[in-house]
């Protein structure tokens, strides 16, 4: 595993997530520098911190330096020139993870589109640096003229988009076929590493790769299950993360758009998180689902890892998420299978009602934890 120095914000949840991203990308964090501000003009950090970083970098000699914020090309170049190391900002790090995780032809195309969008946003500045005789440390472009460079990126983006459009049309045909056959559909959604794939495996009897690492799932997998003796199709989808830029969501649109067409979305929530992390992740999930046009009345909330908490802790967190009056949540354990049967029954009852607004069954801690 390659070594990395991590520069991140001085907040525990942010540090943990940044380290998780590094681990998922195959980097072992050997030193962490925590700062209140990471958006200073020249380096992102102050000159004093840069001097300290130079000393540490010379001593540790890491393979990369990970900067947990979005860097301008000039900032990336300035850091690389001062530290003589490859610099990865937050978005580049996520793209590294995506590239290593992509297994299907479609997910590889989606990652390529996201990479090209990342490159396009930085094209002008990189051309300017190149014309000045300065060579950025990451994605260097040599002496390309700006129009040649732009046209090259646009051409590659159009090629990838064309292939993704074909995949999207094929996906639409599959959706229409499932609808004609009368299949109801369920999709799992939620923050990355919340336990979606583990729950998917428990509900379907599958043995998909599951991990506590971030972004284990990049491509959609669909399987058939029976609920109340009726056939359903259930899909696992890519996880969300805070500060995921719009262009990355757009790149995975053909995969994520499944959420807009499914009958029920199971929003998987890691109820074992601290209240601060829980609120942040839940807010991020709901914002992303809203951007994808997913209606709240089609959502069911699976409060995963509930076997690790006392009833009172779960109730407190349900109040924190403003789900007390919502009738469509249930504490589960994807690992032990606890209440997974009840989750299926809840989904069946909702779909049988044909109108989620009229759904009246109350599911709560008292009703489910005794089973």
UniProtKB/Swiss-Prot annotation:
Q: Where in the cell is it found?
A: Cytoplasm
InterPro entries to which the protein is assigned, alphabetical: G_HFLX_dom, GTP-bd, GTP-bd_M, GTPase_HflX, GTPase_HflX_N, GTPase_HflX_N_sf, P-loop_NTPase
Which GO cellular component term is one of those annotated? cytoplasm
Q: Which residues bind Mg(2+)?
A: 197, 217
- Name what cofactor the protein needs: Mg(2+)
Primary role: GTPase that associates with the 50S ribosomal subunit and may have a role during protein synthesis or ribosome biogenesis.
Which annotated residues bind GTP? Answer: 190-197, 215-219, 236-239, 304-307, 333-335
What NCBIfam families does the database record attribute to this sequence?
GTP_HflX
| Pfam families membership | GTP-bdg_M, GTP-bdg_N, MMR_HSR1
Q: How does it assemble?
A: Monomer. Associates with the 50S ribosomal subunit.
Quick check: keyword rRNA processing in the entry?
no
Is-annotated flag, keyword Protein transport? no
What is this protein called in UniProt?
A: GTPase HflX
Q: Residue ranges of the Hflx-type G domain?
A: 184-355
Q: Which family does it belong to?
A: Belongs to the TRAFAC class OBG-HflX-like GTPase superfamily. HflX GTPase family.
The record's listing under PROSITE patterns reads:
G_HFLX
Q: Could you give a GO molecular-function term held by this entry? A: ribosome binding
Q: Which UniProt keywords apply?
A: Cytoplasm, GTP-binding, Magnesium, Metal-binding, Nucleotide-binding
